[in-house]
């Protein structure tokens, strides 16, 4: 059996990790051992935050809708309930956009929700 020298493989693996760690602070971008830990941790954060992003955007949309709804004299929960009763199927993302960029249309939706509740 011929001897297998693994220097080339190790070099490639190290280069790959150091390339991923490019831009990190201090030893995290230069020392393989530290860079490897940093890259693993970054991956864990990325995995976690891809899930959190969905929650955070929903929270943001709800906060925006609530603020706009209260300017029109109705709470968020009553507004959403009114829209459901009026069978208006617009999701929170679009409602938040309407609340920010088209106040007239949002006011019309609020009136529709209030009418459905009454």
From Swiss-Prot:
The keyword rRNA-binding applies. It comes from the Bacteria. GO terms for cellular component: cytoplasm; cytosol; cytosolic large ribosomal subunit. One of its GO terms (molecular function) is mRNA regulatory element binding translation repressor activity. GO terms for biological process: cytoplasmic translation; ribosomal large subunit assembly. The keyword NAD does not apply. InterPro entries: Ribosomal_bL20, RIBOSOMAL_L20_CS, Ribosomal_protein_bL20_C. Keywords: Ribonucleoprotein, Ribosomal protein, RNA-binding, rRNA-binding. NCBIfam families: rplT_bact. Part of the 50S ribosomal subunit. Contacts L21. Belongs to the bacterial ribosomal protein bL20 family. One of the primary rRNA binding proteins, it binds close to the 5'-end of the 23S rRNA. It is important during the early stages of 50S assembly. This is Large ribosomal subunit protein bL20. It comes from Escherichia coli (strain K12). The lineage of its organism: Bacteria, Pseudomonadati, Pseudomonadota, Gammaproteobacteria, Enterobacterales.
């Amino acid at each position: 059996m011929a001897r297998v020298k693994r220097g080339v493989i190790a070099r490639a693996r190290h280069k790959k990790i150091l390339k991923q760690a490019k831009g990190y602070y201090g030893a995290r971008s230069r020392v393989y051992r530290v860079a490897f830990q940093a890259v693993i941790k970054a991956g864990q954060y990325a995995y976690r935050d891809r899930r959190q992003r969905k929650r955070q955007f929903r929270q943001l949309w709800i906060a925006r809708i609530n603020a706009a709804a209260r300017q029109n004299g109705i709470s968020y929960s009553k507004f959403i309930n009114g829209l459901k009763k009026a069978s208006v199927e617009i999701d929170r993302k679009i409602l938040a956009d309407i609340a920010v960029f088209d106040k007239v249309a949002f006011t019309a939706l609020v009136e529709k929700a209030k009418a459905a509740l009454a």
